[in-house]
Amino acid sequence: MSLAKVKHIVLVLSGKGGVGKSSVTTQLALSLSLAGHSVGVLDVDLTGPSIPRMFGIEDAKVTQAPGGWLPITVHEADPSAGVGSLRVMSLGFLLPKRGDAVVWRGPKKTAMVRQFLSDVFWDETDYLLIDTPPGTSDEHISLAENLLQKARPGQLAGAVVVTTPQAVATADVRKELNFCTKTNIRVLGVVENMCGFVCPNCSECTNIFMSGGGEVMANDFGVRFLGRVPIDPQFLVLIETGKRPTYPAGTTVDGKDISTPAGASTSEEEEVKDGSRLVHKYKDCSLAPIFSKITADVISAVQQ
């Protein structure tokens, strides 16, 4: 396998579509990089590969090396800033056109997943995050079989399971937790995503759906609850346009003031969607301290 230089493999799973799994994968990757770790992201959501867009690199082209592919570099390591490298591989880079549909039957999907695991040349990587499609489909079964058979002992660290608070979501995500049990994949924890909405004017967080469903589910299964993540429009603006997040005076997260300084100006460079600068802009996002804690808990769970 081409995973020889990868220390820890973490799956990001959800039994329900639309819960923000790729958003969670993206922010876990950025947070791990900000913690100084070298990170890889493998996108095996074959029919809906959204990871290239999340990192602002959807126009990148994969380099074919003898015997396989070289992943796309989002940014190189910056030891002086304590930032680790970040690389990405996705089927989205291999499609002739961005809007092309992937109409494959199960055997072809299985073969593609197997090829992604064996033919992508990852350099020294502390954490490889594998973003999966929703449900328990052919991709999941192929991933589980190949990783459990071929990964080194302890290399497959486990899975982070993503849900939203509503019962209609947790009912399906419970099936994903059962899938992990049946395939002997350790659950590192549950993230409750979209648990509230951060107002762009006053930054007050309102529970527009409900709250607590993910924590109840985690407790029912006896797994770690990693935390709640609200919807922040500034994160969406960052991903879609590349603009650095800004917040009104008095905005705090976990007691820390993240207000944008009065009179702060934004250069033209800061307004450009550039994947290589994403990690530095993300530090100003209200979700960054939340994911910093979630990431620390994931690392702790991996090392246990």
Swiss-Prot record:
Return the Gene3D superfamilies for the record.
Answer: P-loop containing nucleotide triphosphate hydrolases (3.40.50.300)
Describe how the cofactor binds.
Binds 4 [4Fe-4S] clusters per heterotetramer. Contains two stable clusters in the N-termini of NBP35 and two labile, bridging clusters between subunits of the NBP35-CFD1 heterotetramer.
Please indicate which superkingdom the organism of origin belongs to.
Eukaryota
Positions binding [4Fe-4S] cluster in this chain are 199, 202
Keywords assigned: 4Fe-4S, ATP-binding, Cytoplasm, Iron, Iron-sulfur, Metal-binding, Nucleotide-binding
The record's Gene Ontology biological-process terms are:
iron-sulfur cluster assembly; tRNA wobble uridine modification
Q: Which residues of the sequence carry a binding annotation for ATP?
A: 15-22
Recorded hits in InterPro entries, A to Z, give: Mrp/NBP35_ATP-bd, NUBP2/Cfd1_eukaryotes, P-loop_NTPase, YlxH/NBP35
Q: What do the Gene Ontology cellular component annotations say?
A: cytosol; cytosolic [4Fe-4S] assembly scaffold complex
Region Disordered: start and end of each range? 249-271
**What subcellular locations does the record give?**
Cytoplasm
Cofactor(s) named in the record: [4Fe-4S] cluster
Q: Name one GO molecular function term.
A: iron-sulfur cluster binding
UniProt entry tagged with the keyword DNA-binding: no
Cite the record's note on assembly: Heterotetramer of 2 NBP35 and 2 CFD1 chains.
Protein's recorded name: Cytosolic Fe-S cluster assembly factor cfd1
Q: State the taxonomy lineage.
A: Eukaryota, Fungi, Dikarya, Ascomycota, Pezizomycotina
- Gene name as annotated: cfd1
